């Protein structure tokens, strides 16, 4: 896996979050060396104090895919 690449993507997402009026946090979900889902902090734009980058990513990914067992995934944030 390319940890540096995935962290750079998370950093880019954190910058995007700040540009969108949120706190600067981003998250990247990876499986088998491939990015499968990304998210940025959306606490302010969604008016939801729980919608941090990581929690929002997990909520959206699991809801969209029906997958709840994430042990084969790596989360970068």
Task: Enumerate the language-model features and the residues they cover.
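Short, basic/aromatic recognition patches
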Residues: 2-22
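Short, basic and Ser/Thr-rich N-terminal targeting/leader segments
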Residues: 21-25, 71
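Short beta-strand scaffold segments in enzyme catalytic cores
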Residues: 25-33
């Amino acid at each position: 896996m390319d940890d540096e690449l995935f962290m750079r993507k998370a950093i880019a997402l954190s910058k995007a979050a700040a540009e969108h009026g949120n706190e600067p946090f981003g998250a990247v979900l990876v499986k088998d060396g491939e990015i499968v889902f990304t998210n940025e902090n959306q606490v302010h734009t969604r008016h939801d104090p729980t919608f941090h980058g990581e929690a929002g990513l997990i909520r959206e990914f699991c809801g969209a895919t029906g997958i709840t067992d994430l042990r084969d995934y790596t989360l970068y944030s």
